[in-house]
């Protein structure tokens, strides 16, 4: 009997110690903003999976080589949110400005075409700092196969840290705008989500839309998007769903659709559509100036 009571006492004591240790090692609860930010990476992961397949690569012809004569910006370092250093192609405003345009590359990387786009936005917008974030940390692809390999090895958490670092680099009083194409179009929308109340306007060119309603509801700025009816990434059906989800979330999305395929706005793309590029660019500039 004594042996039984002793055994029972040991079991109860052990259970109590385990329970105390469990409570001691639990992490504090995340607030709603942190939950939205760190969970629900489905959109980025879905893009990474899709962009790692040959079918996606076939939609992207190797970019035409461009040789810019006099670029306006230079590569500068900044602190990413993961404690590591990031880099960006940066053009400071001619006069001190709290307006920042974050430019995000296509899946090729921060190549000369993106730098030229950053220069053009700087010229046409005027009073703005332009920061084209290097999402691949110095790597650039010249062929669909090499871009596909870069995407397969991409760390989406690192990319979130780069965007967060760029926003912090701009400063707490900065008004954050964003623009990107394809891979960058997806990240332009994610930038608006990550920037929270600092976000003032986001331009997305044929980027994968966000479908998570909590993330869509967290958006605090207007969105303008340009899509191709002949595109399959995102497909017209995905764009229609995006419009419906944004409406359901109570957010303002203006979507323009062109009879064009994927990458229609890239002059270095052999399937470039000049008319769609000109119209969408004029609308993008007007949108950014109005916000």
PLM features: residue spans?
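Acidic catalytic loop of the alpha/beta-hydrolase fold
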Residues: 230-234
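C-terminal catalytic histidine-bearing segment of alpha/beta-hydrolase fold enzymes
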Residues: 249-291
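Gly/Ala-rich beta-loop-alpha elbow adjacent to hydrolase catalytic centers
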Residues: 180-184, 188
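A conserved short beta-strand
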Residues: 198-208
């Amino acid at each position: 009997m004594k042996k039984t009571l002793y055994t029972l006492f040991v079991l109860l004591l052990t259970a109590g110690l385990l329970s105390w240790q469990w409570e001691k090692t639990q992490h504090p609860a995340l607030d709603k903003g942190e939950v939205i930010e760190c969970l629900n990476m489905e959109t980025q992961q879905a893009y990474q999976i899709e962009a790692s397949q040959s079918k996606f690569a076939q939609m992207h012809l190797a970019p035409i080589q461009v040789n810019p004569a006099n670029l306006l910006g230079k590569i500068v370092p900044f602190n990413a949110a993961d404690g590591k250093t990031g880099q960006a192609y940066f053009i400071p405003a001619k006069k001190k400005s709290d307006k920042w345009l974050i430019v995000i590359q296509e899946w090729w990387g921060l190549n000369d075409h993106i730098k030229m786009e950053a220069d053009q936005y700087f010229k046409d917008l005027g009073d703005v700092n332009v920061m084209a974030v290097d999402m691949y940390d110095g790597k650039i692809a010249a062929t669909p196969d090499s871009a596909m390999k870069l995407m397969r090895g991409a760390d989406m958490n690192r990319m979130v840290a780069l965007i967060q670092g760029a926003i912090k680099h701009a400063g707490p009083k900065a008004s954050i705008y964003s623009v990107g194409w394809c891979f960058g179009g997806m990240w332009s929308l994610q930038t608006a989500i990550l920037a929270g109340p600092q976000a003032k306007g986001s331009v997305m060119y044929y980027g994968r839309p966000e479908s998570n309603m909590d993330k869509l509801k967290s958006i605090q700025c207007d969105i303008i998007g340009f899509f191709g009816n002949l595109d399959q990434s995102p497909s017209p059906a995905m764009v229609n769903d995006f419009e419906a989800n944004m409406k359901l979330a109570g957010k303002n999305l203006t979507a323009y659709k062109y009879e064009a395929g994927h990458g229609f706005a890239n002059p270095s793309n052999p399937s470039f559509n000049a008319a769609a590029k000109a119209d969408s660019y004029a609308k993008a500039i007007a949108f950014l100036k109005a916000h």
